[in-house]
Amino acid sequence: MNAKRLMVLTLLLVAAIGATAALKDTVEKDFALRSTNKQVSGVMNKVAKLKLNADEQLAMKFLYSYMPLPDMTDYSVDFYKMNVEYALRTRKEMTWGSKVPDREFYHFVLPVRINNENLDESRRVFFEELKERVKGMSMRDAALEVNHWCHEKVTYRPSDSRTSSPLASVKTAFGRCGEESTFGVAAMRAVGIPARQVYTPRWAHTDDNHAWVEVWIDGKWQFLGACEPEPVLNLGWFNAPASRGMMMHTKVFGRYEGPEDVMSKNNCFTEINVTENYAPTAKAVIRVVDEKGAPVSARVDFKVYNYAELYTVCRKQSDKDGYTYVTSGLGDLVVWASKGNRFGFEKCSVGKQDTVVVALDKTVGFSGVVELDLVPPVERNTVPPLTQEQIDVNKKRLVYEDSIRGVYEATFVNEAKAKTLAEGWGLPVDKVTHFLIGSRGNYATLISFINKASDKQRALNLLDVISDKDLRDVSLEVLNDHFYNTPDLGDGSKFYFENVMNPRIDNEMIEPYKAYLQKALNKLNVKAFKADPYKWADWVKNNIVVIDGWNPQNLRMMPTKVWQYRCSDADSRDMFFVAGARAMGIYARKDLVTGKVQWASAKDEWHDVQFETAEQVTSVQGDLKMAYTKTQRLDDPKYYYHFTISKVDDGYPVLLNYPEEGYNDMFKGGAKIDEGNYVLITGTRLGNGSVLARLCFFGINHSNATDTDLVFRTSDTDVQVIGNFNSEDKYYDFATKSTKSLLSTTGRGYYILGLINPNHEPSNHALHDIESVAAEFEQWGGKIVVLFADEDASKRHKWAEFKKMPNTVVYGTDLNGAIADELKQALNLGSDNRPIFVIADTFNRVVFVSQGYTIGLGEQMINVIHKLNEGK
C-alpha cells in the first residue's frame, strides 16, 4: 500500500472515530436530559441498567433519547433490545455492513419507526427470511433483490389513512403506497441497507399524494418504487409526477446533521427537504407584516391545492424581521400566515418572484370571496436507460412473483367457504361473506371469534363498527375484550355499538382496554362519573399530565398506558377519556368531523369536553344553507373532490372531515354546523393540472341562517385539437378473439383509448376513477378501448378488482406496441409510460391526452365530453 493511500485511510479512520465519539457524547447528554422527566424516568433507568456491550448500549440509548412518548410507553424494553441486536448483526453478517457509516446506520438502519405504523417484530422476521437470499450480493443488487421479495409479498391497493404494520401488510398481501413504502423501508433496514421513506404530502398537478423508498447505496441516496421492482435504481412510474412535485421530504430519527436542507427539527426527528433530488427547485422568500407594514413573527404555512383544500406541505415561523423561506418545486404555493386572530395569504409563484410579502390584513370574522389561479410545475421526465433484455427479464420475474403471492391469496376464505360458515352459524350470508373475505389473511381470527361468541349476532354488530382495515389486522384479544367486557346497557341500537362497544376511537391501532380500565377505575368513584361524565373529565384533566413536544407525529398512546404512566400528549389524553367512558358504559366519541371530544346522555345529545377551559359545553349550532345549481357537467359535487369546508380557528383553517359524500346528501336540505367562522373552498382542475380555486369566507350564528353559494369556476377555453391519431390502427380484441381496427369497434364519433399496465398504481387509479363515473360514461355511450402491452400483461391484471367498469369498455392488446409508438410520436409524449388515455374521434383528431399518475381522470374526461356535446 503506497504512503498516500495509507494517509487517506488513516484520516478516514480518525474522522470515523471522531464522529462516533461526537455521536456518543450527544446521545449521552440527551439520554441524561430525558431521564430527568419523572413520568418516564423509570423506563430510562431500566435501559441505563441493562447489561449490554458498548455498541448495544449506545444503540439503546440512541433510540430512547429520541423516540416519541407512545413508542416508549407502548412497547417493551425487550422489544427494542431485540431490534438493536438484529440491527447490529447486519454490520457483521452482511457484506456491506461494515461499509455503512455511523451516521447512516444510526439514522437509517437502527430506527424501528418509519411512519405512523403500529410497530411489530418485522425486523427479526425479515432478517431471517432475507439473509440467505442476499448473501454475497453487492449492496445495489441486494436492494433490488429485496424489492423483488417485497413484490412477492405485497402489491398496491388503496385503503384508509391508518398505516398497517409491515407484518400486517404481508398478511393482507396488499397496501397503499404509504404502507408499501413502510414495508419496503423495514425490509431494507432489516438487512442493514440504509433506507428512508420519501413522501410528497400532496401533489400540485393532481389530487392525492405518494410515498416511495430511498436507499443509501455506495455513498449516494437513490430511489425505487416500493413493491414495484425495476431492473435498476432511480426508476419508477413516478419519475414524471415527481418532476412536477412542489415538496418531497422525509423524517429522520434523532438529531441528524446531514447535507440536506432542513425543514424543521424537534425532540424526535429532523425533517429534511429532498425535492431537489427529483425536480428543479428555487428558494421562495416570504416576509410577514401587519396591516401597517411592520414585520411580524408569525406562523407561516406553505400550501398546495389538493382534494379541494389548501393543504400544508411545509410549516415555518417567520423571524423577528418577518422573514422565512422555503425551497420547493417551480409552481404556485399559497402562503398563509397567521398570528392570534389575524391572518393573510398570498399566491407565491416559486422561481418567478424574489420576495412575497404577506400582510396580516384579515381578522377572524372576515367574509368575502377570493379567487386564485394555481399552476403546478411542468413535467421534466428523465429515466435511466434500459436494455430490452433487462425489461424482458424483469417482466418474467414480475409474473412469477405475482404467482407466488397468488398462491398465498388462494388460501383466504372464498365465497363458498363463507356461505358454509354463515349457514352453520345461522347468520346472514352477505354480512359474514363481507367480513371474512375482507379480512384477507386474518380470516382465522374472525372465524375463531364468531365461532366462540356467546351471541353471534352481537359479534357481527361489533365487526360492523370497525373499519375494513381493522378486519385485516385486529387481534382475537381485542375482539374478545370489547365483546365480553363492554357494559350491557340494554341498548341494541347502532348508536350503542358505535359509541360504547366500538374499540375504535380515532385513527389508532385498536387495542384491548376495557377489562383493564374497568379494574383500574373501580378504585375511583365510577358511580359519580356515570352520573356526571364531566366529573370524569375533571379527573382526567387533574391526573393525566400532558407532555408537549414528545409526540410530533401525533401517534396514539394506548389508553392502558396512559393510565399506567399518568401522562400523554393532548390527543392521547382525549382518546383516554373516551376509552374510560366507554369502559364505564358512557356513550362517548371523538367526533369524526370536528375532532371534538364528546359524551352523550341520550342519542344525539352530545356534550363537548374542553380540557383546556374546563367548561361544560353543549355545542351551539347554526344553519348553513348552501345553494348549488347543477350543471350538465356536475350534477352532485363531492366533498373532497370538488369542495371542502374548514373552520378558521385562530386565523388558521382546520378542515371539517365530513364523509366522502355528495352535496345532495349532506348539504342540499341545509346542514347544522357549529357557530364560528369558515371558508368554503371549491376548485376546478384543468387538463394541464392547473386549478381555478375559489375561497368563500362566511360566519355561522345560531340566531340566523347563513346563505352561501357553492360555485365552481370554469375555463373559457374551448376543447381544442391537440394532435392526430389514426383510428384505423389495429389491436387484438379479447371479446371477439380477433384483430380489429379501432374504428370498427368504436363506430363514428368520439371514443376513448387507454393504454395501461397491470398491477400498476397509476393504471389502477385511472381505472378506479373511470369506475367512479361509470354511469355517466354509459349515458354518453361512446366506446372506451383499454389495451394491455401484450397477453402476458393482461394475465397479470387483477380483473376482479375492477368489476364496476362501464359496460362500454372493451379490452385488448396493442399489437407489437404500434399504437403506443404512434401516440408517443403524434402527441409528442416524452415516453410511452402508462397509463395513457386519449379522447379522439374517427376523423383522427385528438382533443384530450393524459399520461401517468392522475387523480380524477374519469371526471376530467367526462368534462371534456360534456364540452364536446355543448359544441354540437
Regions found by a protein language model. Give the residues of each.
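Hydrophobic/aromatic-rich core segments of domains that either
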Residues: 32, 132-133, 137, 142-148, ...
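Short, internal strand/loop/helix patches
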Residues: 799-834
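Structured interaction patches on ligand/partner-binding surfaces of diverse proteins
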Residues: 341-363, 686-715
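Thiol-/selenol-based redox modules, centered on thioredoxin-like
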Residues: 833-872
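Secondary-structure boundary elements
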Residues: 27-172, 208, 390-565, 613
